[in-house]
């Protein structure tokens, strides 16, 4: 509780305002999901938040549709700050920031237009950089997938959990969209947290196959490196430790973000682009002494993988194969060395399995993921097979000549 010095002498105590939370939502050619997510945010009962939407280089006029929604739904006194990437990285426009600060949470929105698709890592790094460089920097950043919807008290539960347990990194309890909870349990009476976080045994690092969790040796190594007891998802505790927390609905305290940036140069490891980055962030947080936690009472619903068509394809197999290699950098030295020895064998086995199952596109993606890992290729996926085809036709050389 803080004091107003002008009132303190009169014996009047003024309660501190609730911590400010910047809600970071990424949009990439998915304005329908984003608008549904924004409607969910408007129903939150938490009183002090700033919604930040990063349009990640969309080609479907998403930014204009989001602006139109804001003008139609946020009320006559709303404030919409429409920033370029450059202005956002400066902490926004001072006059707009003042107006945002004076406006109620329900009636303020920041739209940042990225020059290109920066991925999950780059888009959120842009949003976090803007938020923490504002004159009115938030106490927390809440990463929220644009295909997620929240119960009204979700953000309140997350902030309260951190203030009670000093956790710094807390994931919401997410069910697949369409599976509603009843008093934190599904209709069958069993707790459902399939998309929220992972226990030590379930932690699979960065590789999933069609929603399954294969028994990968290298991922067990990542899990075991945490040296934490297993979390029981049916435990009575409202807040439970997990090996990693999903970025689908993840509350991050400012001091944690600043500490991670000091270690690795940015808030999220931008080598990943997408997939596996939140697991790496969880490992980085653990090194700083912060245990990733799951707040069972902070409930949300997540459709999942809408930006990639709703199912696992070549993109996912490429990123999961490549990013597993980079994720090993967060392991202790001995386990990292052991991982490097196992990685090519496991990756080659996975490629052969896809070929035997008649999935050549998945095999090619996993192959290039492994090759690019050793070549140090980071960021957005490059379709090497397509580039080779264009090169054979002479198109690639022509385009390069035109650029130069």
Where do the model's predicted regions map?
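N-proximal low-complexity "stem/linker" segments adjacent to membrane-targeting elements
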Residues: 1-43, 94-102
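Active-site-adjacent helix/loop segment of glycosyltransferases
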Residues: 4, 24, 283, 287-368, ...
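Short, acidic, metal-binding catalytic loop of nucleotide-sugar glycosyltransferases
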Residues: 39-48, 72
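Glycine-rich, basic loop-to-helix element that forms the pyrophosphate-binding segment
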Residues: 86-98, 106, 113-134
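Short beta-strand-to-loop acidic/aromatic patch adjacent to the donor-nucleotide binding site
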Residues: 136-149
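Conserved donor NDP-sugar-binding/catalytic core segment of glycosyltransferases
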Residues: 148-208
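Short, flexible, basic/aromatic active-site loop/helix in glycosyltransferases
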Residues: 193, 199-242, 255
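A short, conserved alpha-helix in the catalytic core of glycosyltransferases
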Residues: 243-261, 266-299
């Amino acid at each position: 509780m803080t004091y107003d010095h002008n009132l303190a002498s009169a014996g009047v105590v003024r309660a501190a305002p609730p911590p400010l939370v910047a809600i970071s939502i990424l949009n990439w050619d998915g304005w329908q999901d984003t608008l549904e997510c924004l409607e969910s945010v408007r129903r939150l009962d938490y009183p002090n938040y700033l919604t930040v939407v990063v349009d990640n280089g969309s080609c479907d006029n998403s930014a204009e549709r989001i602006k139109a929604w804001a003008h139609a739904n946020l009320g006559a006194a709303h404030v919409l700050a429409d920033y370029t990437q450059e202005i956002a990285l400066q902490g926004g426009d001072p006059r707009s920031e003042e107006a945002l600060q004076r406006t109620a949470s329900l009636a303020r929105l920041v739209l940042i237009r990225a020059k290109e698709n920066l991925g999950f890592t780059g888009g959120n790094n842009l949003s976090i950089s803007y938020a923490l460089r504002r004159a009115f920097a938030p106490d927390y950043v809440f990463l929220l997938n644009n295909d997620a919807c929240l119960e009204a008290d979700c953000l309140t539960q997350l902030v309260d959990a951190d203030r009670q347990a000093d956790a710094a990194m807390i994931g919401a309890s997410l069910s697949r969209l369409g599976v509603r909870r009843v008093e934190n349990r599904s209709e069958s009476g069993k707790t459902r947290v399939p998309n929220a976080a992972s226990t030590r045994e379930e932690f699979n690092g960065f590789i999933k196959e069609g929603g399954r969790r294969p028994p990968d040796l290298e991922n067990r190594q990542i899990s075991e490196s945490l040296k934490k007891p297993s979390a029981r998802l049916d435990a009575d505790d409202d807040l439970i430790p997990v090996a990693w927390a999903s970025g689908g609905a993840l509350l991050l305290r400012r001091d944690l973000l600043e500490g991670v940036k000091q270690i690795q140069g940015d808030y999220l490891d931008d080598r990943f682009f997408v997939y596996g980055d939140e697991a790496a962030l969880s490992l980085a947080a653990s090194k700083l002494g912060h245990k990733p936690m799951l707040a069972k009472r902070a409930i949300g619903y997540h459709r999942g993988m809408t930006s990639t068509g709703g199912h696992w394809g070549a993109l996912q197999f490429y990123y999961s194969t490549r990013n597993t290699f980079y994720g090993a950098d967060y392991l202790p030295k001995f386990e990292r060395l052991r991982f490097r020895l196992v990685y090519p064998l496991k990756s080659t086995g996975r490629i052969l399995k896809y070929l035997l199952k008649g999935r050549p596109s998945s095999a090619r993606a996993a192959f290039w993921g492994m090759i690019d890992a050793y070549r140090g290729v980071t960021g957005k996926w490059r379709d090497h097979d397509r580039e080779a085809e264009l090169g054979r036709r002479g198109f690639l050389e022509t385009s390069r000549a035109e650029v130069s």
